[in-house]
């Protein structure tokens, strides 16, 4: 028998999908020939291999992309065409490929970012045509995509461009075509509120693009948006996202003690199997916990920028954000879940610059709500269940009953003050905390609302902060705006002392502030001397505190001459009797504070926007 002309080829060590060959053929081929239409038809019919595509692009430097820019331009142009074709699965595959490609290409380091990126994606001659087609295709898919899956993939592509090209002029094309109606309609139609995080993040990034340098139409859109149904959907999305973000902290360290059970008791002595108890989850080491906490919050935290934009620009949104409730849930309010997550964030804000920036944006948001008289009133009247972080000592007392939002906010500010003390103090963080407390106390005083709260914890924390500032004065005095922080802090304590009768719920709360001033008397004097507070704009307020402390200290010292040891009850009695001989000069302007001005925080807001861009890129891949 004659030998067959067919020969058996050796079996390859590994098989790879056909699309991987096309990736290499497209991006490693240096010739400038146009790929035939059949190539592109096959390319977008094949299911993308995101991992291989991403790795291939990672291996290319910016200069390599410029060398194959002709093929990159062809890819982008054809991907836009197929993404808008409405033909399945080519449209979905094209969007997936665009997501990977744009994320990788826009993350490269270019010598001339704007012009080089334009050269890679479209070419200088065709940039208007290509990008106008891109934004039109994305907007159409977001607003009227045939499936939610297509709509969300279009959002991801837009997020890639918005986050990757944030520092270039390319986002101008996104401001020329208004995506806001499409994004809001998509959010309204989504069944799962958690899915709305990406459209919301996209809206927030677009609203922050060059907003301090030029007119941004998304700013107006945020301010004018009044569709209550969609606003409620947005609030629910914020609620769900904040629950997810908070649960990531809890997964590292569960700060709610497990209730007693027979199974738990048997497990404690090694007999848990008898009660069918689940085996204990291994507890991470302290170093492991530190590393995990440093990674928090997750990338979904970029949505906090959008929350800020809505609260600052739109009073109707703020009212619904505070007043919306979710039926059938134990913790039933978007604002409660937002504040709950913030409380966890504040206890760990010092762990990374990213966490600090997100803490700042949430404090900007809370400050804006507190400054609005109607919202502040709601905060003082609305009572909801709210879980506050108890992951780090010192811990505030556990309150079994539901409390007002205002009381919870004060707790959060105290926690933030107590848990972020460092020699390299984040002065901006503390100015925001103390400023929010000053605004709340001012509102309570003027509205004569007697807020039920453990006020002694506030006095203790504020005066402990004074002691910290005194001990580390040499390290802290050179810090930028430290004097402004001290001025606000002293005014807050003095205002609480002089106006306490108008907002404290009982006489014991008022007595306690005098008691604490006596207790911290030596620290107050040292504090005044360390920061030269006997002169300047803070002098009058500081002198009141020192005078009150000295007045009661002298009375107590006089009694000690008669009685060897005084009990706390006897000291309190002396303080009450001392009111008759205490004279305090009225100090005007203690309740004065400036309304929030966004322009004063321009540099910080730009940094936060860049951080949100980085999180957006991490979110889509």
Residue ranges: model-predicted function:
Residues 30-59, 88-120, 148-164, 203-219, ...:
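HEAT-repeat alpha-solenoid elements in large eukaryotic scaffold proteins
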Residues 2-252:
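Long amphipathic alpha-helical scaffold regions
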Residues 107, 111-115, 167-392:
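Alpha-helical repeat/alpha-solenoid scaffolds of the HEAT/ARM/MIF4G superfamily
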Residues 91, 151, 196, 300-303, ...:
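Residue-level detector of extended alpha-helical repeat arrays and alpha-solenoid scaffolds
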Residues 340-343, 350, 356-621:
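Eukaryotic scaffolding regions of large macromolecular assemblies
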Residues 29, 77-92, 136-149, 182-193, ...:
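Helix-loop junctions that connect tandem helical modules in alpha-solenoid scaffolds
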Residues 16-19, 68-76, 123-135, 172-181, ...:
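Core helices of alpha-solenoid repeat scaffolds
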Residues 27-28, 270, 583:
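Short, flexible coil/linker elements and helix-boundary hinge sites characteristic
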């Amino acid at each position: 028998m004659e030998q067959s002309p067919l020969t058996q080829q050796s079996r390859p060590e590994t098989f790879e999908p056909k699309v991987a060959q096309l990736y290499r053929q497209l991006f490693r081929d240096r010739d400038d020939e146009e790929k035939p239409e059949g190539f592109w038809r096959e390319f977008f019919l094949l299911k993308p291999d995101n991992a291989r595509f991403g790795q291939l692009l990672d291996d290319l430097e910016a200069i390599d992309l410029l060398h194959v820019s002709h093929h990159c331009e062809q890819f982008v142009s054809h991907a836009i065409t197929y993404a808008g074709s409405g033909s399945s699965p080519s449209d979905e595959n094209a969007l997936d490929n665009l997501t990977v490609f744009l994320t990788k290409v826009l993350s490269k380091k270019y010598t001339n970012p704007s012009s080089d990126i334009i050269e890679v994606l479209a070419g200088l001659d065709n940039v208007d045509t290509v990008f106008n087609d891109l934004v039109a295709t994305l907007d159409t898919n977001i607003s009227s995509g045939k499936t939610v899956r297509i709509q969300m993939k279009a959002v991801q592509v837009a997020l890639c461009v918005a986050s990757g090209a944030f520092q270039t002029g390319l986002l101008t094309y996104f401001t020329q075509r208004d995506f806001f109606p499409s994004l809001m309609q998509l959010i309204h139609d989504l069944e799962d509120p958690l899915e709305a995080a990406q459209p919301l993040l996209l809206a927030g990034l677009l609203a922050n693009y060059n907003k301090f340098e030029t007119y941004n139409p998304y700013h107006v859109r945020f301010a004018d948006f009044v569709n209550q149904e969609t606003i409620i959907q947005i609030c629910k999305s914020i609620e769900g996202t904040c629950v997810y973000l908070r649960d990531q902290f809890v997964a590292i360290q569960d700060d709610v003690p497990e209730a007693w059970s027979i199974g738990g008791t048997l497990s404690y002595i090694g007999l848990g199997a008898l009660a069918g108890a689940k085996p204990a989850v291994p507890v991470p080491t302290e170093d492991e916990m530190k590393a995990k906490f440093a990674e928090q919050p997750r990338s979904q935290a970029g949505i906090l920028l959008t929350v800020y934009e809505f609260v600052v620009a739109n009073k109707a949104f703020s009212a619904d954000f505070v007043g919306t409730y979710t039926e059938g849930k134990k913790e039933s309010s978007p604002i409660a879940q937002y504040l709950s997550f913030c409380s966890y964030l504040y206890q760990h804000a010092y762990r990374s610059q990213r966490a600090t920036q997100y803490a700042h944006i949430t404090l900007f948001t809370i400050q804006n709500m507190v400054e609005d008289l109607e919202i502040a009133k709601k905060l003082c009247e609305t009572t909801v269940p709210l879980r506050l972080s108890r992951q780090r000592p010192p811990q505030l007392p556990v309150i079994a009953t539901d409390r007002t939002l205002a009381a919870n906010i004060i707790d959060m500010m105290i926690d933030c003050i107590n848990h972020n003390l460092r020699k390299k103090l984040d002065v901006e963080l503390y100015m925001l905390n103390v400023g929010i407390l000053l605004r709340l106390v001012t509102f309570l005083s003027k509205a004569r609302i007697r807020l039920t709260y453990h006020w002694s914890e506030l006095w203790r924390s504020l005066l402990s902060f004074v002691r910290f500032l005194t001990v580390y004065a040499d390290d802290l005095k050179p810090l930028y705006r430290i004097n402004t922080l001290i001025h606000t802090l002293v005014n807050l304590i003095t205002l609480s002392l002089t106006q306490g009768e108008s907002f404290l719920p009982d006489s014991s709360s008022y007595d306690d502030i005098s008691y604490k001033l006596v207790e911290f008397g030596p620290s107050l004097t040292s504090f005044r001397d360390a920061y030269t507070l006997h002169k300047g704009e803070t002098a009058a307020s500081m002198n009141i505190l020192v005078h009150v402390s000295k007045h009661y200290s002298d009375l107590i010292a006089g009694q000690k001459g008669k009685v060897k040891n005084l009990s706390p009850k006897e000291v309190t009695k002396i303080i009450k009797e001392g009111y008759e001989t205490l004279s305090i000069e009225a100090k005007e302007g203690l309740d004065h504070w400036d309304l929030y001005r966004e322009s004063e925080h321009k540099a910080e807001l730009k940094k936060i926007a860049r951080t949100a861009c980085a999180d957006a890129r991490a979110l889509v891949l």
